[in-house]
Each structure stands twice: as structure tokens, then as C-alpha cells.
Amino acid sequence: MTGWLSPDEWTAVALSLKVALWATAVSLPFGVLTAWALARWRFPGRQILNGLVHLPLILPPVVTGFLLLRTFGRRGIIGQWLDQVGIVFAFNWTGAALAAGVMAFPLMVRAIRLSIEAVDPRLEQAAATLGASKPWVFLTVTLPLILPGLIAGAVLAFAKAMGEFGATITFVSSIPGQTQTLPSAIYAFLQVPGGGAGAARLVWVAIAIAMTALVLSEWLSQAVARRMRGA
């Protein structure tokens, strides 16, 4: 199996997994908070927040990548200040994780929000009347009930992050060994004569990773559902 892919191809696969995992893990707490706010809170600007969250799904990925570059690039609005403390996103794998997280965030929020909206608010209110604080109500009542949706949202975000191309290549380019992820490596193969075989190998790897993630998500969701029914 090791000889099936070249060292550069393995590097692209490993980098994609690293980027997708970091993008999912870092964005998950923000995804839960945003989904909770959109599902349970009523506040001025709620629809604006909802629109901003889903904007990456509507904008061309290249536009999102350009906005990230103008914001978090070394001369960007925020990036120039981060650069002074040694935090660099542009043309770095961390920037690839940021771009992947931004593009995957809407899918994560939507899945978690639907799960929260499916929870009967009276269950949360009953716990609150017994003296439980809002964080404790969330941890002991809401979170167990939305766990299947949370898992689904995380897997959707991971899959989207694994396949992210447009925003990533615009923001961090495609530097072999540094920012060249699986999709950008496939694209690079397709730009050279005779690169179809290498692209095909990486396509099969991408399919295998996606199927593994989906099967694992389904298994975890069913395991959680069985445990809840047993409880």
C-alpha cells in the first residue's frame, strides 16, 4: 500500500487529513454556539447572522479565498497584526485549515441547528425549573439529545474540509509539502501530460476517506441512539 502512492502524494493525503481534522475540531465549539443562538435566541440582527453564516455556500469559493487573503494575509486587516506575534495564515497549512473551516462551517451549523430545533423546549424548561443553570441544562439535557446531529454536522464539515479547493488555493496557493492538499494535488496532476494516473490514485483515496467518514458517522449516530433508548 505504501508503494501505491509516491511520497509527495502521501504528504498531500496526510496534509488534507490534518487540515480537515483541525478545521472541524476548532470550528465545532463555534458551530454549536452559533446553532444554539440561531435556534433558541431572538435578537436584533439574527437574520443577518444567519446570512453571514451561510454566505460561504452562496459566494464562489474563489471570492471567499480572496476575502480571507485580504483579511488574514500578511498585509490584511487582521493578518498584519497577527504577523507581528508570529501567527501566519497566508501560504501556510494553518491558512488551509482556516479556509476549510470557513467553507465547512455552514454545513455544520445547519445540521446542529436542526437537531436543536427538534428538541422540545419544555424539557429544557423543566430542568431549569428544578434549579439547573443554563449551561448545566445544555450539558445534561440538550447535548445528549442533539449528539447524533452534532456528529452528523462534524462529519459533514470534515468531508467538506477534505474536499475544499477554491478558497484554499486562492488563500494559500498549492505548495507541495506545505499547502498542497488532496484536491489541489489532483488538480496539479491534471495540469501535466500523463498525470491522469496520479490523479486517479488520489481520487480513489478521497473516495475511501469519505466513505469511511460516512460509515463511522452512521455507526456513531446509531450507537448514541441505541444508548439513549436504553437509558
Question: What are these regions, as identified by a protein language model?
Answer:
Residues 73-74, 150-188:
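Non-cytoplasmic
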Residues 25, 109-112, 116, 120, ...:
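Transmembrane alpha-helices
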Residues 45, 106, 110-124, 128-129, ...:
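C-terminal transmembrane helix and the adjacent membrane-cytosol boundary/short C-terminal tail
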Residues 20, 24-32, 36, 62, ...:
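Hydrophobic positions within alpha-helical transmembrane segments of bacterial inner-membrane proteins
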Residues 1-25, 37-46, 188-197:
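Periplasmic/extracellular loop-to-transmembrane helix junction in inner-membrane transport proteins
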Residues 1-8, 171-211, 216-219:
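Interhelical loop and adjacent transmembrane-helix boundary motif
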Residues 2, 65-101, 171-175:
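Membrane-interfacial helix termini and adjacent extracytoplasmic/periplasmic loops
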